[in-house]
């Protein structure tokens, strides 16, 4: 899988720009605040339907525009595809594949497979559970459209259930209706948690092997799923569903007092360890960055094995964060992957030959070759 070109109209600081790419290594370089990351953002938008930097589409619109358009030409084992995303302020995004509008954003998932690695990814380790859930959800949504739909439905049910818990405070006759939402939530939760458990187990196996190579066998990396529901068997959705309902019943009074749902996939987490120690609490900055590199390389391997396609790799200003050894390890392991690297100094890569390196200089929202 590779991207041939992307067209940006009124997207961030790009007025009207067509950018062609190499199938191999694309070095996007230039001074800060010129628009390098905006290219990465536009590619990721075409993969996931959303920006990795903001949840507000209005922030993607050029200061002189009233909307934006992104058109991406893609080649995969399924043939050529055109992904187009159009947005006008005050209206919903329109997503098209080969000029056919999609009824649901979920239909975009899996058409362009992408792995993104940016300095902000350190939050996966340093911050709370929501960042870690977001990481696995982004990958799983690309691999399994059904997971995207389950997650979307779960969030709707969760919102409705929380509203009901608040209404019950002054409408006690609504208490009996809570059971209906419990069963809906349990059904969706069982599928989401089973999928997450399987994915995290696979992620752990692969990233552990990669990390051992990266650290010359000195660090054993572990990833452990920590669901908010106390479960012994995460492989059986039916058992998860029954146990989920039982635990909801056991905390009913507490939830009614707090007016919020206290268990479910929205409170899941997973722990990362090095040699048995919590990476967030005890890992050095270097260990945390190396662990992230192992995670991202494992993500690429999982996507490839699940889809028989190499994803595109988006490296946004991370090469300067890695030391020479880790930088070389990364470059050696992505030779067959179309890669986009943003940086201020192209000299880091001038001695590297991937067969078809392309250097793209960015200045004030314009690109030069």
Swiss-Prot record:
GO terms for biological process: DNA replication; DNA synthesis involved in DNA repair; double-strand break repair; SOS response. It is found in: Cytoplasm. PROSITE patterns: RECF_1 (PS00617), RECF_2 (PS00618). ATP binds at residues 30-37. Pfam families: SMC_N (PF02463). The keyword Transcription does not apply. GO terms for cellular component: cytoplasm. Keywords: ATP-binding, Cytoplasm, DNA damage, DNA repair, DNA replication, DNA-binding, Nucleotide-binding, SOS response. It comes from the Bacteria. InterPro entries: DNA-binding_RecF (IPR001238), DNA-binding_RecF_CS (IPR018078), P-loop_NTPase (IPR027417), RecF/RecN/SMC_N (IPR003395), RecF_2 (IPR042174). SUPFAM superfamilies: P-loop containing nucleoside triphosphate hydrolases. Its main location: cytoplasm. One of its GO terms (molecular function) is single-stranded DNA binding. The keyword Methyltransferase does not apply. The RecF protein is involved in DNA metabolism; it is required for DNA replication and normal SOS inducibility. RecF binds preferentially to single-stranded, linear DNA. It also seems to bind ATP. Belongs to the RecF family. PANTHER family: DNA REPLICATION AND REPAIR PROTEIN RECF. This is DNA replication and repair protein RecF.
